[in-house]
């Protein structure tokens, strides 16, 4: 019953927002994971969005008793836009481990898609008894009148949680695919994305619930 309730709440949460969870995967060998010190990385050229996103997640993790560090606090802003070799990333991982980090949360945009949504639904229209003239007149406005459709953009994103533990290896713990539909403000989108992400991570027992049930402001 508890699981069904959680699913119902999640569906309600998703349907009320412009951020949707499309799919996710959890390492079957890991039932529960607890970050003690986590690096938060948002890969985007939009520095404002990256800063808000990383700061919001940092605050949420800290509210749960986890030490969290933004990539913008540790590296130059150009860190995510410059190519890294496998050797360089290995060195970075070793530095993180030696400084007490045991996990990395990495979010990036993996695709962009332009969409068209028609405002009028023609599925129930009687297709049996109509003439060419009626058919043409009914559908012509779809193509010639912009008021009949909405154009919007979907950003396909991926968030991955990695363990960089000294004893457990450097393994992928969880991966989620989230779609952002036509974002109208950075702050609103960040709030929706982070809230949904945290909800899923809590359900998967990969992050502790809030110590205090209070809204965290940017």
Model-derived segments and spans:
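Residues that line or immediately flank small-molecule/substrate-binding pockets and catalytic motifs
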Residues: 8, 108-111, 180
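Surface-exposed short loop/turn segments
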Residues: 87-160
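N-terminal segment of the mature soluble domain
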Residues: 45-115
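Sec-dependent signal peptide recognition
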Residues: 2-7
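C-terminal/domain-edge helix-coil "capping" segments
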Residues: 17-34, 134-218
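C-terminal motif of bacterial Sec signal peptides marking the signal peptidase cleavage site
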Residues: 12-15
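N-terminal export/targeting and maturation segments
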Residues: 27-53
